[in-house]
């Protein structure tokens, strides 16, 4: 797949900002130059080398191991032989490393451990510079700023307190550090992955690249079809953003989909295999307790989480407690040895408006808070997954309860969808809820594509989902008073009022689409300097009339 960056993001170049504490780190940002060539703004960029016009990437080679020296220079990790996996050699990543890194002893190698010990890591400085997006010179345009300047020390404090996480497995050195927390920019996740109906490794890798070029901050590989292990290896080796998974899917695949044959040893083996590959965060459905399952029987849509349903069925078959819950501390020992973050799964989330905010959902949430405390004692990073399907008037309660039960650990929500009546448009029904819940304090929003509830998303669906959720996240950032969000709106509105059409296109989330819509009715180059568009024409343009009014008032 050939991506033309000059078409997707005209008048943009990747530039690299050096660190101050760590002089050797360089943070990539997208510089958008205005048509007058004298002004520009910097935009947070998630594409890594895939969004740099000067770098030719090849998915067969993977991308640069940006953090490898940072990791090994700490001298608290060592190489060992990776577990041997029986996979189809014809689909294997060609440059697969047979060694993996792990902590040298029982001491954690997590960003939380370093933060608690007053160590500012290169990862922490990196995310601080990314979050600021060079806003200092433009702060005069940001009234009512309520978010402080992001410094490496602030990042350290937030990670140490558990209010933010930096997902960064030591076996994923290709990743560019990013931070998830309510005092930072709202992030978005894009789900990709094959199914039993559709399995194509090349297609999934390109979905990942497409997603991050358009702004996905993390990607989850939710593959349930063929070649799960190899698909994930290809994705990780080519990904500059953190990769998350739901390990229970592959564990179930190992027992041919027979839930009753699952056990903790199979799950543990799967965790370690994925840890060695470099997965940055795991969704673990440890809060689905046996005693909670009874409260889902009267729901309209029952248990809609795949992981939650698997665990519930296992508990029912064996009449035993959830093995993820009973072995949680052993899972923590694995996580802290590789710096894998927990994404504590909401296996009992509501799957319909009728089931929102019910007893099962909030009992599980309370348990997730208890598990968060245990993980923090092991210096593991934690975020909490949330719903789901929730009407607008019930959204705030979700955030309030999550903050209370989970002690401000970052909240990561799927939408929520605010109505169930629009299959084919659930990227919109969910973006309404996503913007609201982001404003209330959710740290990361999991995108929903137009194909939700209908089928596996294709490349265009991925793009639509990412753009829709970038809008929701940005709207939440504006509501929270984030100055870097305000600056982009200010710049685009200024271009719009002054009929600088190309600057208006180029500052938008999707310049290619914005320009194509303008071209449908006014395709000529002359129209790109006209003081009107086809909506109002030259006589009824309110902005043109306002310009004349302002001119008259100065005479």
UniProtKB/Swiss-Prot annotation:
Quaternary structure and partners: Homodimer.
Binding site for substrate: 191, 220, 249, 285, 305-307, 346-349, 385, 412
GO BP terms: thiamine biosynthetic process; thiamine diphosphate biosynthetic process
Cofactor note: Binds 1 [4Fe-4S] cluster per subunit. The cluster is coordinated with 3 cysteines and an exchangeable S-adenosyl-L-methionine.
Binding site for [4Fe-4S] cluster: 533, 536, 541
Pfam families named in the record: ThiC-associated, ThiC_Rad_SAM
Record bears the keyword Zinc: yes
Species: Ehrlichia ruminantium (strain Welgevonden)
E.C. no: 4.1.99.17
Catalytic activity: 5-amino-1-(5-phospho-beta-D-ribosyl)imidazole + S-adenosyl-L-methionine = 4-amino-2-methyl-5-(phosphooxymethyl)pyrimidine + CO + 5'-deoxyadenosine + formate + L-methionine + 3 H(+)
NCBIfam families, A to Z: PRK09284.1, PRK13352.1, thiC
InterPro entries documented for this protein: ThiC, ThiC-associated_dom, ThiC/Bza_core_dom, ThiC/BzaA/B
Key words, A-Z: 4Fe-4S, Iron, Iron-sulfur, Lyase, Metal-binding, S-adenosyl-L-methionine, Thiamine biosynthesis, Zinc
Domain of life of the source: Bacteria
GO molecular function, one term: carbon-carbon lyase activity
Pathway: Cofactor biosynthesis; thiamine diphosphate biosynthesis
Protein's name in the database: Phosphomethylpyrimidine synthase
Entry binding sites for Zn(2+): 389, 453
Function: Catalyzes the synthesis of the hydroxymethylpyrimidine phosphate (HMP-P) moiety of thiamine from aminoimidazole ribotide (AIR) in a radical S-adenosyl-L-methionine (SAM)-dependent reaction.
Family assignment from sequence similarity: Belongs to the ThiC family.
Entry annotated with the keyword Zinc: yes
